[in-house]
């Protein structure tokens, strides 16, 4: 008798393998064939972290007590360093104990936030064009995807007239993967923008906060690139009242040349963070202590290090 075929879960039919995972395989295959490839796949800094970061990692890794399980919500040292980072660069006050949460990269945070705020069948507002994981994870979790457009003639900023039409239900068919709920639960935004390069604008952040407050929608700003395009570092949490209705992701991948370390964070009000932590604590068990303490050390990098490693280096390459 033939064995009965085992089938995957239905949700896998909704998505493909991660876009950049597929592209990296393609690039690796072409390199193996001897072709000279300029990879335009995932954006991965090719410069190292600061020397003090590497030295701290080695120091902690040699400590006998460094290799056990760590707190899911991160070590106090890392949380305090993240709070200090926001105060230093954005002039935003965050309680290190309750208003931020370390992540194993921002991509993990997209999953946790969607699980914490979105029920199956709810609608999620996703930028088009935009980072593909906002769409794929929302689909896996049974949400309706509603795209809002970013246009070059508008500096790749949201069209708030379109957003108002979507929320009012006057354009229910645009970009959906199912019936549009009366009010979307979540809006994803990302500035500086990937893939367009559109720059963050404080007036956009102010409009997003106003939109969130008026419609009871949580705005999630994915902010890993604020050290790349300019010396003006902006955060949506700089807007008064933003913490009550917004969540912001930040990451050390681009700002500190640490993409492989998988260290990110989310920041918001204490209640939102507690909901996200409830999800996170049931999925993962913390990050290696050496990585956490070395990341805390990296947050101490000098202004000069950031200027040379980020602003000047990328500015020179754009002129090449």
Question: What does each model-identified segment do?
Answer:
Residues 241-315:
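Conserved core segment of the aminotransferase class I/II
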């Amino acid at each position: 008798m033939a064995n009965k075929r085992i089938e995957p879960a239905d949700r896998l039919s909704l998505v493909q393998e991660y876009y950049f995972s597929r592209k990296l395989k393609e690039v690796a295959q072409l390199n193996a064939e001897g072709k000279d490839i300029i990879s335009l796949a995932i954006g991965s800094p090719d410069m190292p972290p600061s020397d003090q970061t590497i030295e701290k990692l080695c120091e902690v890794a040699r400590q006998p007590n460094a290799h056990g399980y760590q707190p899911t919500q991160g070590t106090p040292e890392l949380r305090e360093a993240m709070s200090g980072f926001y105060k230093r660069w954005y002039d935003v006050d965050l309680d290190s104990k309750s208003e931020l949460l370390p992540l194993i990269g921002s991509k993990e945070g997209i999953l946790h936030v969607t699980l914490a705020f979105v029920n199956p069948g709810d609608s999620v507002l996703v930028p088009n064009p935009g980072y593909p994981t906002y769409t794929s994870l929302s689909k896996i979790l049974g949400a309706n995807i509603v795209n809002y457009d970013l246009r070059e003639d508008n500096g790749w900023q949201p069209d708030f007239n379109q957003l108002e039409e979507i929320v009012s239900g006057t354009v229910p068919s645009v970009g959906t993967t199912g019936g549009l709920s009366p009010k979307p639960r979540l809006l994803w935004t990302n500035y500086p923008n990937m893939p367009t390069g559109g720059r963050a604008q404080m007036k956009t952040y102010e409009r997003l906060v106003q939109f969130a407050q008026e419609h009871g929608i949580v705005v999630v700003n994915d902010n890993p690139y604020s050290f790349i395009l300019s010396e003006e570092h902006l955060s949506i949490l700089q807007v008064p009242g933003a913490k009550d209705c917004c969540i912001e992701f930040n990451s050390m991948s681009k700002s500190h040349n640490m993409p492989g370390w998988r260290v990110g964070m989310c920041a918001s009000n204490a209640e939102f963070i507690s909901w996200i932590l409830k999800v996170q604590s049931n999925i993962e068990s913390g990050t290696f202590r050496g990585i956490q303490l070395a990341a805390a050390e990296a947050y101490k990098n000098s202004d000069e290090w950031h200027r040379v490693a980020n602003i000047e280096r990328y500015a020179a390459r754009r002129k090449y």
